[in-house]
Amino acid sequence: MPLAKDLLHPSPEEEKRKHKKKRLVQSPNSYFMDVKCPGCYKITTVFSHAQTVVLCVGCSTVLCQPTGGKARLTEGCSFRRKQH
């Protein structure tokens, strides 16, 4: 284990584990995602840390439930993280 550590060039894995405010460049942990309904295959945009129950527009199926942090997706729902 080396005693000298490069603070200006941390590894991406190490940087991702840090708190969002203590990173070299601050970035949020939250993101938007496209969630596909398992029943009608419609795509809905959902926030990763949603605080309310999100329903499908087409068939009113519950897509995700809020928890203390990230929203929990319902079984069978597939998602894709949106690019900014």
UniProtKB/Swiss-Prot annotation:
This protein's record includes keyword Phosphoprotein: yes
Sites of Phosphoserine modification: S11
Domain of life: Eukaryota
Assigned keywords, A-Z: Cytoplasm, Diamond-Blackfan anemia, Metal-binding, Nucleus, Phosphoprotein, Ribonucleoprotein, Ribosomal protein, Zinc, Zinc-finger
First and last residues of each zinc finger (C4-type): 37-59
UniProt note on tissues of expression: Expressed in a wide variety of actively proliferating cells and tumor tissues.
Involvement in disease: Diamond-Blackfan anemia 17: A form of Diamond-Blackfan anemia, a congenital non-regenerative hypoplastic anemia that usually presents early in infancy. Diamond-Blackfan anemia is characterized by a moderate to severe macrocytic anemia, erythroblastopenia, and an increased risk of malignancy. 30 to 40% of Diamond-Blackfan anemia patients present with short stature and congenital anomalies, the most frequent being craniofacial (Pierre-Robin syndrome and cleft palate), thumb and urogenital anomalies.
Family the entry assigns: Belongs to the eukaryotic ribosomal protein eS27 family.
Protein name: Small ribosomal subunit protein eS27
Upper classification of the organism: Eukaryota, Metazoa, Chordata, Craniata, Vertebrata
